[in-house]
UniProtKB/Swiss-Prot annotation:
Family named by the database record: Belongs to the phosphoglycerate kinase family.
Pathway the protein contributes to: Carbohydrate degradation; glycolysis; pyruvate from D-glyceraldehyde 3-phosphate: step 2/5
Record-listed substrate binding positions: D21, L22, N23, R36, H59, L60, G61, R62, R113, R146
Gene: pgk
Record-level Gene Ontology MF annotations: ADP binding; ATP binding; phosphoglycerate kinase activity
Protein's organism: Shewanella loihica (strain ATCC BAA-1088 / PV-4)
Single GO cellular component term: cytosol
Entry EC number(s): 2.7.2.3
This protein's name: Phosphoglycerate kinase
Length: 391
């Protein structure tokens, strides 16, 4: 279905309201990680170049809805954008009943979550936002899975609703990875719990050629294979589920490989002493914190031969270097692979940064929850809204 792309529109003299994901960490009034801000800059710059009066809105943190709280103010974002855009940028605190916006400047709305009804997608709030603009641009993939007033409702009532370049690029990359992927398609799903990623694992096991599990999730699969996991984080109640997923994958000619060697310790701490063990030698007091080098090499070989790689989640506690070798090897293998690769999710992006492979990954997704819901095959409300407005 055709979604209108902002890049194709004439915006000269138009009031353009862009919903970005500018939810960044702030400490003492200063932005401490600017990845999302950097990702939004090309869209804002393009709207300025096209001669628009640009308004930008986003949420930041989780304030109590309807209450102003300076801790969650957009002011640090305004300060950052003013330096990055080299044009006047100002904060609008009260904007719902009208706001002055001029060509050549950027007006940043105060945190949308200070508005009562934002999360519930309140119709009256959505209509007020829509009345502020000639063109509404949804560019926040990170919140595309939420039907809220600033991400969904406003687009139903704005004169024109379109996708910004960041969102359009995200959908194109995800489509390339999932709709018609170059085979073999390999997915790496890490993280601590099977329960939080069960639907993703279900969905992926039906379409990928090889599903690789890591982190705490892998421990449940190790237990399902009949091995002792000691005191490791795992979910005993999901062992049958893990067995079923493996059987499903194998019936399709795929597999969910279980590590053959693991790195264990007796405590979870930055100074814990790491010990390498065969997977069938794990003792009752051991905790598994990483895959071993043999397992990492086997996975690297799978990645080397892949046509498409989807990476969501590390395979070990990589924050501690002694348990980071598995994730480091996976990161290196993805960097070296000729496959189309897409990485998403907070921990994954931290690993991409730590091992300095950002320029070797084909596409880095800005979405966490939205990335997972896309992988699950769910319809994203904001995308559905844009499709309905594009017809």
């Amino acid at each position: 279905m055709a979604i209108i792309n902002m890049s194709a529109l004439d915006l000269q003299g138009k009031r353009v309201l862009i919903r970005e994901d500018l939810n960044v960490p702030v400490s003492n009034g200063v932005v401490t990680s600017d990845a999302r801000l950097r990702a939004s800059l090309p869209t804002i710059k393009l709207a300025l170049e096209k001669g628009a009066a640009v308004m930008v809105m986003s949420h930041l943190g989780r304030p109590t809805e309807g209450e102003y709280n300076s801790e969650f103010s957009m002011q640090p974002v305004v300060d950052y954008l003013e330096k990055a855009l080299d044009c006047p940028v100002r904060l609008a605190k009260d904007y719902l009943d009208g706001v002055e916006a001029n060509v050549g400047e950027v007006v940043v709305f105060e945190n949308v979550r200070f508005n009562v009804g934002e999360k519930k997608n309140d119709e009256a709030l959505a209509k007020k936002l829509a009345a502020l603009c000639d063109v509404y641009v949804m560019d926040a993939f990170g919140t595309a899975h939420r039907a809220q007033a600033s991400t969904h409702g406003v687009g139903l009532y704005a004169p024109v609703a379109c996708a910004g370049p960041l969102l359009a690029g995200e959908l194109e990359a995800l489509g390339k990875a999932m709709d018609n992927p170059a085979r073999p398609l390999v997915a790496i799903v890490g993280g601590s719990k099977v329960s939080t990623k069960l639907t993703v694992l279900e969905s992926l096991s039906g379409i990928v050629d090889q599903l690789v599990v890591g982190g705490g999730i892998a421990n449940t699969f190790i237990a399902a294979a009949g091995h002792n996991v000691g005191k490791s984080l795992y979910e005993a109640d999901l062992i049958d589920e893990a067995k079923r997923l493996v059987a499903n994958a194998q019936s399709r000619g795929g597999d969910i490989p279980v590590p053959t060697d693991v790195v264990v310790a007796s405590e979870f701490s930055p100074t814990a002493s790491a010990t390498l063990k065969a997977v069938d030698q794990v003792a009752d007091e051991d905790m598994i914190f990483d895959i071993g080098p043999d397992s990492a090499e086997a996975l690297a070989e799978i990645l080397k031969n892949a046509g498409t790689i989807v990476w969501n989640g590390p395979v070990g506690v990589f924050e501690f270097d002694q348990f980071g070798e598995g994730t480091k090897r996976i990161a290196q293998a993805i960097a070296d692979s000729s496959a189309f690769s897409i990485a998403g999710g907070g921990d994954t992006l931290a690993a991409v940064d730590k091992y300095d492979i950002a320029d070797k990954v084909s596409y880095i997704s800005t979405g966490g929850g939205a990335f997972l819901e896309f992988l699950e095959g769910k319809e994203l409300p904001a995308v559905a809204m844009l499709e309905s407005r594009g017809e």
